[in-house]
Amino acid sequence: MMRVPVENLGLFEQLDRIVVAFFRKQQSSSPYDLYVSITQEHVDQKKQELEPLGYQAVKLPLGMALDNVIQQAHFKALIIGGLAPEEIIVSKEALMPMKDIVDSFCIMYAAANNRLENGKAYELMKDKTVYFIGKLLTDSLKKGDEISYMGIERESADGTSYEAVKCFLTKESAEQYNDAKRPVSHANLAYLKAFWGNPVIIEPHRNYWIEFK
């Protein structure tokens, strides 16, 4: 088993990847590690090893497996199999900096799969920080800075087009779509929506995108 810095694992890029996690069927009185399998070979190996010990295999997105380890007291670490020749162990503490991002992903994923109403999703996300390509009117503006945002053309149900503000969960995610190398800024989601007076769309290039009008 090996330890790898969490920032080197690229977990954010794989949040919606379907994995197999092994949960105990009975509630445990002592904390245990959550095993997650990325490959079928590792799934088969872990089933043979863990099912006789009272574990069951559950398919879910990697982001939800991370959320379980972060939020639930009875998990002490995440063990990932299939990413490298050896299993990789990541402690709960190492995952904590991802807590807000993982929480946002779970909300967005549930809404994208019609398990959460858009309005409820907004209530859960409105106080979160998001990133956008551009600048707001702030004290940190320098001469030559432009108050602007990068938008995306959208089409409403009646066929009319409108523009939504592109937002992202991380600065690194925003930079992937920032070919013009404009400033990347962060802001409270509700404030950003009110400031521009436009709909916002979060992670528009991913399968779990969400839009708030």
Walk through the language-model features, giving the residues of each.
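An interfacial alpha-helical scaffold signature
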Residues: 1-213
